[in-house]
Amino acid sequence: MSDFVDEAVLHLKAGDGGHGCVSIHREKFKPLGGPDGGNGGHGGDVILEVDRNTATLLEYQRRPHRKAENGAPGQGSNRSGASGADLVLPVPDGTVVTTLDGEVIADLVGHGTRLVVARGGRGGLGNAALASPKRKAPGFALKGEPGEKVDIRLELKTIADVGLVGFPSAGKSSLIAAMSAARPKIADYPFTTLVPNLGVVEAGQTQYVVADVPGLIPGASEGKGLGLEFLRHVERCSTLLHVLDCATYEPGRDPISDLEAVERELAVYGERTGVDLSDRPRLVALNKIDVPEARELAELVEPMLVERGYRVLQVSAATREGLKELAYALGEQVAAARAARPPEEPTRLILRPREIGEIPFQVIPLGNNVFRVIGDKPTRWVRQTDFSNDEAVGYLADRLNRLGIEEALAEAGATAGAEVHIGDEDNPVVFDWDPTVDSEQTVLGPRGTDPRLS
């Protein structure tokens, strides 16, 4: 069974932030030591990183659930909790990251390129960081935020310069084995190649990568044979090489009809995926000319192919005849394609910033004096609040009021006793709104309490 896997679905969870600490400094002869609770550590991110030594997504198919490390809670004496370690997942060069609905998130190309796919939760503030002139010794701390949960799909599109296309048993694997150090499985029956094979070829000063993909047959676009699923591996190829079998004895088969059939399947693939392969330079290798009848057939069809605009070379993977000329011809095409490319950008870290001018929150009337507040800040603040602590709840009320939610609710038509939903859509926190609370007053009372909630 092959170990090559080019698709995988991952279920990822970033680390949760550590909770802040509630602590009061206690020392002999210092009765008013003040708050000294440390902050919680941040949760670890989940990061995808291109690694040139990784060639398959097999490990992620076997273990699709991954989780980064949580942040540690804060401690007394102003000791912050340790941040959780990032979880770095190596992926092959050419991995495309999409949502489960098919929306492309990133195309990871180039060794060392990184993508943060799930951000760790921020650590909660300890009571030392929450102290203010109005609240000198807070009796509460903020909880750490949960890390992001994401489900993504990884799809590998091999990075190669030349893609070999043709019928099964046309000799593609033998050709790549003869031209490079690759050692694919070779046998005299169709569909021996079940996974893409890569080989590095040197032609003078030019070095390039050749990809041998499983063979195509008429009707591959309808699911016959191995279908078209492996054609994604030639999408990035700058040059395509038709490998045509001149020694086949199958009825209805000849190099011209084989080439036309493969071109039809390439066109169907382009229509389905939106990837136009028609503009890629094509060369034709008439293979197996070590067989006398095959050489005669190659001499017969070569002028027909040249008339169609193809550059044609007669080769034999078995005797290596014509392979040097083929390697240099492909090298010329690859060098020309590389010269036409824009200069490579340095390895980059891919971020997903929020839109500029993002609205901090929005009040949505649901009817019957029920309202929903959505927005990043209110949702995050609710997650950070310890609702078993009245002082923490009062602090949340102050923050929401300073953000302008009280005024927005009034403008939306909310009246006293309105039901207000804030937080995650599937599990919001429900408040009974009391517009008479004056959150600007000085809050005094025992730690952990709020006079407004008594």
UniProtKB/Swiss-Prot annotation:
All residue ranges annotated as the OBG-type G domain in the record: 160-335
Is Nucleotide-binding included in the keywords of this UniProt record? yes
Q: Which molecular-function annotations from GO does this UniProt entry contain? A: GTP binding; GTPase activity; magnesium ion binding
Which ranges form a coiled coil?
A: none
Q: Which cofactor does it need?
A: Mg(2+)
**Predominant cellular place of this UniProt entry's protein:** cytoplasm
* Segments for region (Disordered): 60-87
Checking SUPFAM superfamilies in the record gives: Obg GTP-binding protein C-terminal domain, Obg GTP-binding protein N-terminal domain, P-loop containing nucleoside triphosphate hydrolases
Report any Pfam family annotated for this entry: GTP1_OBG
Report the EC code(s) recorded for this entry.
3.6.5.-
Q: Which UniProt keywords apply?
A: Cytoplasm, GTP-binding, Hydrolase, Magnesium, Metal-binding, Nucleotide-binding
**Where is the protein found, in the record's own terms?**
Cytoplasm
Write down the top EC class of this protein: hydrolase
Tagged with keyword Magnesium: yes
Positions bound to Mg(2+)? 173, 193
Q: Which GO terms describe its cellular component?
A: cytoplasm
Which biological process terms from the Gene Ontology are attached to this UniProt entry?
ribosome biogenesis
The role this protein plays is: An essential GTPase which binds GTP, GDP and possibly (p)ppGpp with moderate affinity, with high nucleotide exchange rates and a fairly low GTP hydrolysis rate. Plays a role in control of the cell cycle, stress response, ribosome biogenesis and in those bacteria that undergo differentiation, in morphogenesis control.
Write down the PANTHER family for this protein, in alphabetical order: DEVELOPMENTALLY REGULATED GTP-BINDING PROTEIN-RELATED, MITOCHONDRIAL RIBOSOME-ASSOCIATED GTPASE 2
Family, as annotated:
Belongs to the TRAFAC class OBG-HflX-like GTPase superfamily. OBG GTPase family.
Q: Describe, as the record does, how this protein assembles with itself and its partners.
A: Monomer.
What is the protein name stated in its UniProt record? GTPase Obg
Q: Which organism is it from?
A: Thermobifida fusca (strain YX)
Its organism's taxonomic lineage begins at:
Bacteria, Bacillati, Actinomycetota, Actinomycetes, Streptosporangiales
